[in-house]
Amino acid sequence: MNPAACVGRFAPSPTGPLHLGSLVAAVASFLDARAAGGRWLVRMEDLDRPRCEPGAAGIILRQLEAYGLVWDGDVLVQSQRDHAYAAALDMLKAQGAAYPCACTRAQLVQAPRNREGEMLYPGTCRNGLPADTVARAWRVRAPDASIRLHDRIHGDLQQNLAREVGDFIVKRADGLFAYQLAVVVDDAFQGITHVVRGADLLWNTPRQIYLQGLLGVPTPTYAHVPLITNVAGQKLSKQTRAPALPERGRDATLAQALVTLGHPPPGELAGAAPAELLTWASTHWHIENVPTHPVVAKPAP
């Protein structure tokens, strides 16, 4: 493919500063784009406003710069794009692919769960709202068909949306648009061709591919890098109190991220500046070297 046509992205949620797990995802997407001579964009996924932390977006951008991860173009901010998501929802409504749902969480507490612990919607409102109810959210009808996906790290996968996911929400009861819709709209808007992100989002990908088909937008290639866990096996996150990226010793932290991705830098680069490490890594990037299994973050000595 024409290298100039390769566009990757890093799309953090500003719920706090970046940690090692988010650095690994950022580095992987950066290297994948740069190795192809392409562009690397940044998007702030602040769609879930109640979870966002004031000032976190600025902190994240400064962390990226400090670690040598320089992006192209302007940063796209999801909270400024409700008009685009509303237009996409209108398209789904016009096709009959989306329908209003009046169900509350309390009403769905007994619904079955899938292997990811997500609720499998029982279809209560699929054929129309029950009497004396009002719409609270909007769902997309999940087809009883397998959505196929080739992941550049995990290989060929498939998921039956109706049986494994169920009709899923695209606009929430609190009026916020759901991640599944927003990410599809924004990837298309930014011309993203290569999505490289954490393996916790692999399960969501067939839903996004289905929405791409309904909305008539291209499907990018996907690669899901391993999750970084603590010694208890929990994904590094704000909820598990993952420490923020250190301001000192960035070379060692970046080298740790590269080792995690199966690209250990040579000994002569010990202590090298982040920009030098990333230059080396972009010329040696081979996505087939990235492991498929979660990696335990070793505590700092």
UniProtKB/Swiss-Prot annotation:
ATP binds at K238. Transmembrane segments: none annotated. InterPro entries: Glu-Q_tRNA(Asp)_Synthase, Glu/Gln-tRNA-synth, Glu/Gln-tRNA-synth_Ib_cat-dom, GluQ/Sye, Rossmann-like_a/b/a_fold. A motif ('HIGH' region) lies at residues 12-22. Pfam families: tRNA-synt_1c. Keywords: Aminoacyl-tRNA synthetase, ATP-binding, Ligase, Metal-binding, Nucleotide-binding, Zinc. Its EC number is 6.1.1.-. Binds 1 zinc ion per subunit. Zn(2+) binds at C101, C103, Y121, C125. Catalyzes the tRNA-independent activation of glutamate in presence of ATP and the subsequent transfer of glutamate onto a tRNA(Asp). Glutamate is transferred on the 2-amino-5-(4,5-dihydroxy-2-cyclopenten-1-yl) moiety of the queuosine in the wobble position of the QUC anticodon. This is Glutamyl-Q tRNA(Asp) synthetase. It comes from Thiobacillus denitrificans (strain ATCC 25259 / T1).
